[in-house]
Design a protein with these regions (language model features):
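Mobile genetic element proteins and their domesticated derivatives, centered on retroelements
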Residues: 15, 29, 40, 51, ...
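Mobile-element integrase/transposase regions
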Residues: 68, 109, 113-169, 173-176, ...
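C-terminal, beta-rich DNA-binding module of retroviral/retroelements integrases
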Residues: 281, 285-386
Length: 386
């Protein structure tokens, strides 16, 4: 007979009464109530042992769970999450394994489930992401191949002044080389930060930035005073494509972590914010595991550059068959019978003209090509570089 509209518990009670009354075999009872013989014998056994109370739903949890996570492990994981709220289960477990290698730590998926069960995981908002463009920039295969730099977006401090965080990282090891709380974006404040980094860590091969100031400027090849200085030191400036911050994606991700751990809420004043940055960078470099590094720390994967910071800028050297000219403070150079304007940021520097065809010259500065110069029309055509 159909038993629609009857609750499972009422159905079990009816079965138990019919079982006690007798008159029907177990097979007939089970057919009558639409259950299997296995279920019928189970209900009958529970009724005989516990009465009607035995017919209620029983827990499906096993009596013994050999793979269950221990209370001490769960407590340690949750405590680590409270101390590092921006770390996921994978990073937390990697750090805990280093400090307590003999403990039976769970898999990252189990760790995530434990954190969620204890209310320590906040579901992130969905963010629309654009399609990444292929990056033409070379990867870093060892420390100091590429350093990346950027200004994290400014924010207001407790005293109503603004903080402009300047950050500098080694791309290969993820080491934070500098994180400076500056009151403004200006070359006069930025250059000393790079000088300290160069003294502490040596010189990189390439320095990657966006196209904003003071890393770039309007004018010929978007050279700035800062990038001219880098070139004089033998550092190749690299710029990501306009409108493509994903080409510096690891640095952008670092900025999100930096903001979450040091600026929510901001400090009372600039000096206090700098102390937060210093504490964060120490932990980020020496304690925070990185999945891209096999859960190692940046400090364990970094070594200083073998290229020391010079006490004086080395002179520029060009091939002997190039024609070298000194740029005036006005940004002009005398060439082909008249003045030729380049850019004021090259004032006092030496550039070189290489003849590549009859009446056609390539203009060089340090290791980069600046422009093509056509003598007949006196036309200067900039040559873009990365």
């Amino acid at each position: 007979m159909p038993w629609q509209g009857v609750s499972p518990m009422d159905l079990r009670r009816l079965f138990a009464r019919a079982y006690v009354a007798g008159g029907l075999s177990m097979t007939e009872l089970c057919e009558h109530y639409g259950i299997s013989r296995k279920t019928g014998y189970k209900w009958a056994a529970r009724f005989e042992l516990q009465g009607l109370e035995g017919l209620g739903d029983h827990s499906r949890r096993p009596h013994h769970s050999p793979r269950a996570t221990g209370a001490a492990v769960t407590h340690a994981l949750c405590d680590a999450r409270r101390r590092h709220p921006t770390w996921g289960a994978r990073k937390l477990l990697a750090g805990l394994r280093r400090t307590r290698p003999t403990w039976p730590w769970p898999a990252p998926s189990t760790g995530s489930a434990l954190l969620k069960a204890h209310g320590l995981v906040r579901t992130p908002r969905c963010r629309r992401r654009g399609h990444a463009s292929p990056s033409p920039l070379a990867p870093a295969t060892r420390p100091n191949d590429v350093w990346t730099t950027d200004f994290k977006g400014e924010f207001r401090l407790g005293d109503r002044t603004y903080c402009y965080p300047l950050t500098l990282r080694d791309l290969h090891s993820r080491l934070v080389l500098r994180c400076d709380a500056l009151p403004e974006k200006s070359g006069r404040l930025v250059r000393p930060c790079f000088e300290r980094a160069f003294r502490d860590h040596g010189l990189p091969e390439r320095l990657r930035s966006d196209n904003g100031g003071p890393f770039a400027a309007p004018g010929l090849t978007r050279l700035s005073h800062l990038s001219v200085w880098w070139l004089r030191l033998g550092i190749q400036p690299e710029r990501i494509a306009l409108g493509h911050p994903e080409q510096n994606g690891a640095h952008e991700q670092f900025h999100r972590v930096l903001k979450a751990e040091t600026a929510r809420p901001p400090a009372a004043h600039l000096a206090a914010q700098q102390r937060r940055f210093r504490h964060f960078c120490g932990e980020y470099n020496t304690a925070r595991p990185h999945e891209a590094l096999g859960d190692a720390t940046p400090a364990s994967c970094y070594a200083a550059s073998p290229r020391p910071y010079p006490t004086r800028l080395p002179p520029l050297e060009y091939p002997g068959h190039w024609d070298v000219r000194r740029v005036a403070s006005t940004g002009q150079v005398s060439w082909a019978g008249g003045p030729l304007y380049l850019t004021e940021v090259l004032g006092g520097e030496h550039v070189a003209f290489e003849e590549v065809d009859d009446g056609l010259w390539m203009l060089h500065f340090a290791t980069i090509r600046l422009a093509r110069f056509e003598a007949r029309t006196r036309t200067l055509t900039p040559v873009p570089y990365a």
